[in-house]
């Protein structure tokens, strides 16, 4: 069984913001794999299905970004999901829009949703797909930037990174994460 989590904030006002690109990737996977995100439990919304013979759970924590681990850990405990069968998708300011970086482990890098996940799992050693949102320009505050919507110029790159993140998740169902890192980080 695999768990794929996209980080974001709940509520319509955050729907298409930069900080919610992880949620957008989960929506893409749900559409691709015909998985309904209709279960509400573990402080999140999730759905399960079978993809290429593998049971997959897709989760969007509804805790607000900074408390994401409060949703992830109880679901992992309930379904007895090992950390190596878990991947998290989230926004990253240090990566250009349209680009991805896959990592096997690491620090939170200033991302509060990842910080919460590390805190609740008790380890930094989990797989992640970092989706580029770039840095704010013209002195804009980071909080205003990540909670802002993508510009029309950014949308093609955003759609590309959502597609590539979904492709990476799909390959991960049948290949080691290290192998797909080599493919998608190049």
From Swiss-Prot:
It catalyses: an N-acyl-L-alpha-aminoacyl-tRNA + H2O = an N-acyl-L-amino acid + a tRNA + H(+). The active site is at residue 19. Pfam families: Pept_tRNA_hydro. Keywords: Cytoplasm, Hydrolase, RNA-binding, tRNA-binding. One of its GO terms (cellular component) is cytoplasm. Its EC number is 3.1.1.29. The record marks 9 as: Discriminates between blocked and unblocked aminoacyl-tRNA. Gene3D superfamilies: Peptidyl-tRNA hydrolase (3.40.50.1470). InterPro entries: Pept_tRNA_hydro (IPR001328), Pept_tRNA_hydro_CS (IPR018171), Pept_tRNA_hydro_sf (IPR036416). It comes from the Bacteria. PROSITE patterns: PEPT_TRNA_HYDROL_1, PEPT_TRNA_HYDROL_2. Monomer. This is Peptidyl-tRNA hydrolase. The lineage of its organism: Bacteria, Bacillati, Bacillota, Bacilli, Bacillales. The gene is pth.
